From Swiss-Prot:
Pathway entry: Cofactor biosynthesis; biotin biosynthesis; biotin from 7,8-diaminononanoate: step 2/2
Native organism: Caulobacter sp. (strain K31)
Protein's job: Catalyzes the conversion of dethiobiotin (DTB) to biotin by the insertion of a sulfur atom into dethiobiotin via a radical-based mechanism.
GO molecular function, one term: 2 iron, 2 sulfur cluster binding
Encoding gene (name): bioB
SMART domains: BATS, Elp3
Record: residues binding [4Fe-4S] cluster: 62, 66, 69
Name of protein: Biotin synthase
Length: 340
């Protein structure tokens, strides 16, 4: 418990070694859960969840070859490429999200990097969403330092740019963008004064050491991610990694919980978010993730191109777990529950 006591007594560490992170993964499951829950309670109210909603504002046709992604132009997944949405449409979707209880609205575009020509339309989206009282987040691929400053000036609060996996396995995931380019974009975001949203995907065929390496990278950044999404791969037919996982099997649920728990311990102040793959998780598995330190989720029925649980199911789960959203939003029982 020495490392955990240090986490409770001081600001988060940035000097984790990879062997130390691996040792956390190797703890007996119940001990790991206890340590993660202890850290979580030191920094957060364990009964609160942050609710975010993500909208794909530009879908498909991406030039990247990320082996998990349905939106890559390199693979035949049946997804039709679409143009960048108009700001008015995005703002209307954000209003619906706010009225549904979301506190943060994220906008995602399927392209390799942000083009300067799209900045005015994106700035209008950001300003309109912010005017609704929502936190704003965007995931728009690689940025230059100047673009990061312009997004900050437009009012963007958070920028998402995932590392996806550890550097050792990264070459098996994507070859059109280097690991260093991802780190550079995160540096531009930090330097511009925006908060970072950065995590990865598990269940892509990587080893436990690769998962530890990803979390080691995140825990040794100059500042820990403000939001740390943990995605479970949703296998998409026609993508290399999706087809591989369908052949070889998906990640074990308890191993996923271990990943969430270690993320909580090494990045104690981050909002650890259950992201893609939650629709395939049982209520019990989600509850274990919350106990392990996850305190943020995506809602809204869809995450870019993959499904999420519907709000009625989420509301019932939150009620049964005695959990509530952060802020002023309230979860109300769906009609089917209220009638029981």
């Amino acid at each position: 418990m020495t490392q955990i006591n240090a986490q409770l007594a001081h600001e988060p560490r940035h000097d984790w070694t990879l062997p130390q992170v691996e040792a956390l993964f190797d703890l007996p499951f119940m001990e790991l859960m206890f340590q993660a829950a202890t850290v979580h309670r030191a920094w957060f109210d364990p009964s609160e969840l942050q609710l975010s909603q993500l909208l794909s504002v530009k879908t498909g046709g991406c030039a990247e070859n990320c082996g998990y992604c349905s939106q890559s132009a390199h693979f035949k997944t049946g997804l039709k490429a679409e143009k960048l949405m108009d700001a008015e449409v995005v703002i209307a979707k954000a209003r619906e999200a706010r009225d549904g209880g979301a506190q943060r609205f994220c906008m995602g575009a399927a392209w390799r990097e942000l083009k300067d020509r799209d900045l005015p339309k994106l700035a209008a989206m950001i300003g309109g969403v912010k005017a609704l009282g929502l936190e704003t987040c965007a995931t728009l691929g690689m940025l230059t330092a100047e673009q990061a400053k312009q997004l900050k000036d437009a009012g963007l609060d958070y920028y998402n740019h995932n590392l996806d996996t550890g550097p050792e396995y990264y070459g098996d995931v994507v070859s059109t963008r280097t690991y260093q380019e991802r780190l550079d974009t995160l540096a531009y975001v930090r330097d511009a004064g925006m908060s970072t949203c950065c995590g990865g995907i598990v269940g892509m065929g990587e080893t436990r050491r690769d998962r530890a390496s990803l979390l080691h990278q995140l825990a040794t950044l100059p500042s820990h991610p403000d939001s740390l999404p943990v995605n479970a791969l949703v296998p998409v037919a026609g993508t290399p990694l999706g087809d591989k996982v369908k052949r070889e099997g998906e990640i074990d649920g308890l191993e996923f919980v271990r990943t969430v728990a270690v993320a909580r311990i090494v990045c104690p102040k981050s909002m650890v978010r259950l992201s893609a793959g939650r629709d395939d998780m049982s209520r019990e598995l989600q509850a274990l993730c919350f106990m392990a330190g996850a305190n943020s989720i995506f809602v809204g029925g869809k995450l870019l191109t993959t499904p999420l649980p519907n709000m009625d199911d989420d509301s019932k789960l939150f009620l049964d777990l005695n959990m509530r959203p952060m802020g002023s939003a309230k979860i109300v029982a769906p009609e089917s529950v209220a009638a029981e």
